[in-house]
Amino acid sequence: REPRDDSPLRLIPRGVVYSLVWKYVLAQVRVEGRDDEAILVVRALRGTTWHADNFARLREEMRAPPRSTTTTGKENAFVAFVVGGGRIERDDEAKTISVYGYSKTFGRCPGCNERTAIILREAFPEYETTWSDDGY
């Protein structure tokens, strides 16, 4: 279910993808103790070698203010798990994003690349985003 308007999940960007080719993870994030809402987020970050590196950086991001604190000052504890992963190629000159392959670490996830492409179309509306389950 989509997060409520006042949910701290709304502070977490859905799609963060750097230029060039990177391994990516698709992760589900929720606020600890609140199973009624969750979001899917994509991370393909510069300087990461492995899918797990992207997940580790996402976990660091979730602990950093202001995402870890509500407007009332109450601390949030975010919980995340990897749904799947693959590769993303972002070409800023051509304004294209390609999602493909799978993660050997986290396994093949049916629909993962398609869901990732949907998230990236919203995050990067000026880019043409395509997906495929081909490749590694």
Model-identified regions with their sequence ranges:
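Intrinsic low-complexity, intrinsically disordered or marginally ordered coil/linker segments
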Residues: 1-136
